Amino acid sequence: KAEKIEQKEDTVKYNVQAFKAPEDRVIEDVLKRMPGISVLDGGKILYKGKPVNLTIDGLDMLGGRYAIATKNISPDHIATVEILENHQVIKALKGLVPSDLTTLNLKLKASSRGVFLLSLGGGLGYGDDWNRDVEGAGMYFGHKSQHIVTAKTNDIGSDLRYELTDQSMPSDAVRNYSQAMMATPPDLNRERYYFNDSYSATTNNLVKTGKGITVVFNAGYFNTSDLRDSRNETSYMLPDSSVNRICESISNVIDEGRLYGDVSYKVNNEKVYIKTDARLLCESSDVLSDVNGINQDYASKSL
C-alpha cells in the first residue's frame, strides 16, 4: 500500500488517491485536504504560507493562471502531487545559485498521458427565472505537447474571473471604480450576492520543440454582467422629538470584459537559459449607477 505522504530531501509527495473523497470533482478539491497546502478563495495556492508555481508533469504551460488546471483537471487523472522546495527552475544555475522558490507539480497517471480527456458538467434550474451552470474542458497531455481548452457560463454567483487571473500578480478580483457610486456589498460570501451573467473561454498550449525548448501560446476571454442594489436609511432624533430620516438607494449594472493572449519561447538546459515573452491584455468596464434617481455612467478601457 502506497504511503499517503513521502518526503525525500526537499521533495514531498502526496498520494492523491489517499486524500481523495467521493465528492471531489477537480484536483483543487483534493489539494485543500493535503497538509501544508492552502487554497485561497480566488484559487491561489500556498504551501506553508508561501505562494507556489505550478507545473504539470514538470512543464509550465499556464504560468500564474494555474487555476485553469486546478479547477478543471479531475483528481482521477493525477497520481501524485509533488512539492519541490528550494526549487531552482533555471537548470544552468542548479547547484550554483540557491533558490527559495516552491513548485507544486501535478504528476499525471500513465493512463492519462497521450490520450484525449474530456469533462462536461452542467445544471439548469428554475426559480423566479431560469438559471444555468454549464462548463466543459478538453485536455491532452503528451510527452511533446500539452493542451487545455475550456468554456464556461453561469448565472448562479460563481465568479469565473478567478480562473483567468494570474495568481503571481496582485489581486484584481475587486476593481476600484473610484468615479462611480457603488452599492455597498453585504458581509457575506461573494457568491451570495453576486447576481451575475458570466462567460469565459480559454485555450492553453505548450509544445516541446527540442531538448529543454518549449513554446507556449495561451489565450482567454471573459465577460460578465453584475447587478447590485443597496438601500441605507439613517434616522436622527432631533431636540423637539421629531425624527429626520435620510435614505440612500443605489443600483448598479456592472459590465466587465477581458481578452488576453500570451506567447512564450523558452530554452532551459544545463548550459543555456533564454526566455522571451509577448503579452496582450485588453480590459473594459462599464458601470451604470442609479443614486436616488440620478443616473451616472462610468466607463474605462485599457490595452
Task: Briefly describe each language-model feature range.
Residues 2-286:
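Membrane-proximal, glycine/serine-rich, low-complexity loop/turn segments characteristic
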